[in-house]
Amino acid sequence: MNFDFDSQTRRKLGYQLIEVVDRFFASLADRPVQPAAEDRIYPPRLSRLPETGEDPAQVLDQVCCELVDNGFHVPSAHYLGMMNPTPTYMAFLAESLVAALNPQLASLDRSQTASRIEAETVRWVGELVGWRTAPSGTFTTGGNEANLSALAMALSAQFPGVIENGLASIGAQPVFYASMEAHHSLDKSAGMLGLGRKALRRIPVNERLQLNVQQLEAAIKEDLESGKKPFCIVATAGTTSSGAIDDIPRIHEICRRYNIWLHVDGAYGAAVLFSNRHRGLVQGIEQADSVTFDPHKWLAMPFAAGLLLTRHPEILGRTFSVACPYLQKAPAGTLPDNRNISAQWSRRMNSLKLWLTLRVHGRRAYERLIDRQMRLAQSFSRWVANSEYFELAAPQVLPILNLRVRATGIPPQKLDALHASIIHASIIEEVNRDGQRWISAATVNGESVIRTMVISYLTEERHIKDLQASLVAACSSLGLESKSNRVPAEQPMMPSGVQLTPAALENAPPA
């Protein structure tokens, strides 16, 4: 069976796809994120496995129409929800080229050019971190893999025999630390590494939602006294819920004092390194032993494009290197085999999209993007401060805003967590109902919030104003009273327009 087509058919199908992609990109400034609520019907696909083929042009047209017309479009400029960006067009071209060439990055002898491009991209970003001497690292599928790999490196660094002999050789329970707001991939990693999820010590946060360093040090002392083995502290640069950035210099001092590995999860926030104006927000990141960074967040890369960066190439190699008799070993003095510096084995070339975008647009394009999105978020914050309905529930550090409704008609002392959670979920449901825009719910330091963020490079002031108008309209339609018209209630009753719909309950964060 020949899966190829003749040149004429290949060109026809390629042009057909390019036409769809071009129309899609051209529509993104005003394209709705998803169909309206009444049209979101997604029955299971029940067709049988095809025994014979169909016309490729018809099949391609059908799936393009289905995905574009009925899909959920995170590239839309109106997508103001999670950390999912509008991809650059150069990234789309890079992904197409990689799919065609299919380089295998496990072994250097079969990926010399691809591996050189990847190593160069790693070096570029590592130098932005502040590591001028031999920054090393590898592309990953995202922050989950990068954090898992960093914890494996930390174990290898602190307990050199653990990779060969296992956790039992340590002789005591290894423990590591992160804030209550740190990413939940750390819990998953603790389980996958065999540490057990209880090995992750979640430390409370301060008023700025940063890891509380006093309580961190107290927890370390307590664990040492009980015979446990602290091996890593994870500082977060840009939490998912609020964008908070931990105090990296102070955490580094604690790491130095107790000889503990410092990992910075900068999956989102480390992108500020591309901005001279804002890189100070992650001051001290150069002191980290390893860094997680996801270009598929703020750098507008399509999935998957994660990075694990380190200033300890020897520990990276010690953690992941294995002898493999059926693969040729990379010659001494050249680049390492990627399988020996990564949790992955066979893998695609995830670096080309970032490399190509940087070659075409340069660092300064990202600097302009980051600076502009910070200005949009700051303007949004000022609107919230003057809003009749909302207030900020957390400091705005990066282009993420946490909104708390204050115009409920319920006295603050009687507005419990459940009521607030349901009201917020109802507002989100109302804002998202027509499909034009999309925002999300979150829980920040145990409190329900409405979460919005600026992530698309296409988002402008007009998109923010549209969201603001929609938020106000949602409050009005739900019967919420503006602060100037608030009437105290005797009992915490739900506003008249708030319905306990299944969607609202589903969207409500835990109270």
Language-model features: locations:
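N-terminal entrance/gating region of PLP-dependent enzymes' catalytic architecture
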Residues: 1-134, 433, 437, 453-455, ...
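Conserved PLP-enzyme active-site core in the AAT-like
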Residues: 113, 146-317, 502
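Short loop-beta-helix segment that forms the pyridoxal 5′-phosphate
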Residues: 125-153, 201-204
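Short Gly/Ser/Thr- and Asp/Glu-enriched loop/turn motifs at secondary-structure junctions
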Residues: 133-134, 394-399, 443-449
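A short linear hydrophobic-aromatic micro-motif
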Residues: 135, 388-392, 436-441
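Active-site C-terminal subdomain of aminotransferase-like
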Residues: 239, 258, 283-388
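Conserved PLP-binding catalytic core of the aspartate aminotransferase-like
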Residues: 391-431
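PLP-dependent enzyme catalytic core of the Aspartate aminotransferase-like
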Residues: 441-511
